[in-house]
């Protein structure tokens, strides 16, 4: 269903914080972006052998960096992708229960790529039966401007790997209008979001004036890009629009729509899910304190104004960080 067709069906209210419950014991690693020594102890969230590390990052605008805005991020490191998937499902299900009860709706933003495989445990017991899927409203942080049944479509990827396996109402899944141009699809998606804010389905950030999604489940490319915001591309500096478009993506297909950083950074929760040695360089840079505002990777520009940011990683992804 396109966004314009889906908005009419929607209506509800607001957001608060997750009281995190302690999970079964797991290993813990304490570190910061300044490279403090590692230590061990209990882990508050992961259900499997994992490590935890608060880290620092720089805000997305040079002005914020100049103001010395360094926000804490939590880093969870898992021995295996299976363990990561179990913990990510638990994290998302707990947020769903908490925020759906408080707001009457749960707004979830997905990315493409391996993220859909990583959330597969949500479509299995116990979550398949225990999650209130009727409260879910699903969006995409970016989308390729291709038909919905095209192999490059993030919608198709999510439909095949996740959405077809859980009972989320069709009218609460907000795909782009694939009959429009990239510019038209971006404008249409932003119009949809504004209507859903007006209806109370999506909260509005009081501090930023941008929509405040309950949780964004995001991935990162080996070059440090998130959404369709690529290193060195002018779109990383867009600070007015909610949704914009790109026609010269360095990664095919070239035409896409994407949320902007003000929207990403207004989220209540972000889970950055990154696995594999191929992304270790970008992870090391993102969690280092040596960056300057002139050489930030897009992933470093994801700094929540008033929310909680958690990295879900495996050991290969943080191998350069641990060896530092």
Swiss-Prot record:
Keywords: Chloroplast, Hydrolase, Plastid, Transit peptide. It is an enzyme of class 3 (hydrolase). Residues 1-61 form a transit peptide. Pathway: Carbohydrate degradation; pentose phosphate pathway; D-ribulose 5-phosphate from D-glucose 6-phosphate (oxidative stage): step 2/3. GO terms for cellular component: chloroplast. It catalyses: 6-phospho-D-glucono-1,5-lactone + H2O = 6-phospho-D-gluconate + H(+). GO terms for molecular function: 6-phosphogluconolactonase activity. Hydrolysis of 6-phosphogluconolactone to 6-phosphogluconate. This is Probable 6-phosphogluconolactonase 4, chloroplastic. The lineage of its organism: Eukaryota, Viridiplantae, Streptophyta, Embryophyta, Tracheophyta.
